[in-house]
Amino acid sequence: MSALYGTEIPFVNSAFDIAVTTKTDPRSLRADARRNRERVLAAAREQFAEHGLDVHMEQIARAAGVGVGTVYRHFPAKEDLLKALADERFARFADKARAALGDPDAWNGFCGLMRESARVTAEDRALSEAMNQLPDLCTASAEKVRLIELSRELIERAQASGAMRADFSADDVPSLMRGLARATAPHDTGPPAMSWERYLEIMLAGLRPPRPGTLPGGRS
């Protein structure tokens, strides 16, 4: 079993321990089961951010204050848990994008979404790396689709206002954010990593419309 999944532990301990996968709508769970699921997600988010993807399910259970069987009933494998956290992140960003559409300044609304995305990515690099390395975590996410649609609307709005260069598209955003994450990741050798705030502002400046000027090589 790889480090991603940690130690394999049977999760069916009794007749009651029937797996409830992440395909189950959390809203259909009993109130106590829903609370336990939320506690597991909160603990997993904290443990992954602090210790990376090598965290075992038993550690998450201890941090959540529940039995390991409870963790496995909701998330039979670590990948299921990561999928739920990724979907939760997409939902958070989509809500931010929806709010940004209400900003009368289209450019300011777009920048607000990008800053929030960069901040969350920097604070929880383990989940960010998992989402980049394991594309299957994100392929079936309805929240990801919603985020993409809202991001496209934000970009078109900023372009229509003249605040953003016309050749930028929503398809460029994931690559830019991955580049930002890699450039600002802490490392053991070489020069210190640039802060994500500084790198992001440089990137945003590059999305402004190009200024008119004389091309190199022209006559004076």
Language-model features: where?
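Short linear capping/connector segments at secondary-structure termini
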Residues: 129-138, 217-219
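Short hydrophobic/aromatic patch on the recognition helix
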Residues: 65-75
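Basic, helix-initiating cap at the start of DNA-binding domains
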Residues: 1-63, 80-83
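C-terminal peripheral helix-coil segments that are non-catalytic and often amphipathic
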Residues: 1-24, 148-160, 186-220
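An amphipathic alpha-helix adjacent to DNA-recognition modules
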Residues: 34-42, 49, 53-54, 74-95, ...
